[in-house]
């Protein structure tokens, strides 16, 4: 069985409310999520189950509490509807509004109890804030209580204006922001506070496993109890690329096959030299 853990979709109402989300960095236009289209793609490439998520990095950008909640509900309702109609083909990651923690926790409870969703997708930062900060503790408490996985996906970073030329934000900054966000989660002791936390790092975790020895350094006084490496090795890493085969082998040699998940990054994904 092939399960694609990195399968993005854009409901029509979501695109209407965030017009800038209608095109990716290449200028390729997205259209409203269509179940049949996605199922046809899955049949074409032999994918048995697609785990639906949204890139979702723009939701908190304006700091608008009501709009953030509305956008998340649109995403979550759409994905839950797809799962209800095709329960053996679609699974779902919820997106939570991080402007207000009461809204965040309430929406998570709704997604798990009413919508029967299967985990949570969060961007690497929300409007420039990283989710290891103390203000997001209610999110972590609710996530841990639900016992389902957290999928971390790159988003535009606070320093992006320095990287826009030549689209370097897409090529380098996004993997860098994944490395930053996940490292901060580890160093902040999140895995110590929530020992049963299951985390999926998209795009093979950015540069984490390339720089594992450096990430073990104790400068800056990380509060995690164990060597940072021991936490990074508990994380699951998806293959959304393009990724060179040598990098996948490095990940395999470092964490083993059980920690590697298939991800295609549809509809964004593009092949590379080894794809």
Question: Could you say what each language-model-derived stretch is?
Answer:
Residues 1-275:
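Helix-coil boundary/capping segments in enzymes
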């Amino acid at each position: 069985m092939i399960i694609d853990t990195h399968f993005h979709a854009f409901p029509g109402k979501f695109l209407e409310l965030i017009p800038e989300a209608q095109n990716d960095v290449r200028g390729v236009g997205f259209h409203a999520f269509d179940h049949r289209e996605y199922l046809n793609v899955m049949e074409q490439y032999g994918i048995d189950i697609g785990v639906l998520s949204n890139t979702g990095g723009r939701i908190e950008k304006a700091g608008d509490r009501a709009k953030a909640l509305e956008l998340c509900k649109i995403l979550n309702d759409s994905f839950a509807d797809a799962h209800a109609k095709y329960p053996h083909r679609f699974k779902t990651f919820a997106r939570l509004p991080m402007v207000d923690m009461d809204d965040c926790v309430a929406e998570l409870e709704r997604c798990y109890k009413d919508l029967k969703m299967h985990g949570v997708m969060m961007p690497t930062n929300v409007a420039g804030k990283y989710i290891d900060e103390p203000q997001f503790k209610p999110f972590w408490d609710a996530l841990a209580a639900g016992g389902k996985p957290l999928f971390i996906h790159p988003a535009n970073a606070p320093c992006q204006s320095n990287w826009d030329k030549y689209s370097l934000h897409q090529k380098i900054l996004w993997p860098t922001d994944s490395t930053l966000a996940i490292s901060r989660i580890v160093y902040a002791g999140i895995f110590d506070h929530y020992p049963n936390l299951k985390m999926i790092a998209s795009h093979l975790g950015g540069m984490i496993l390339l720089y594992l020895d450096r990430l073990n350094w104790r400068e800056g006084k990380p509060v995690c109890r164990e060597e940072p490496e021991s936490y990074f090795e508990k994380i699951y890493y998806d293959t959304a690329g393009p990724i060179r085969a040598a990098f996948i082998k490095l990940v395999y040699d470092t964490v083993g096959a059980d920690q590697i998940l298939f991800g295609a990054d549809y509809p964004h994904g593009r092949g590379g030299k080894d794809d």
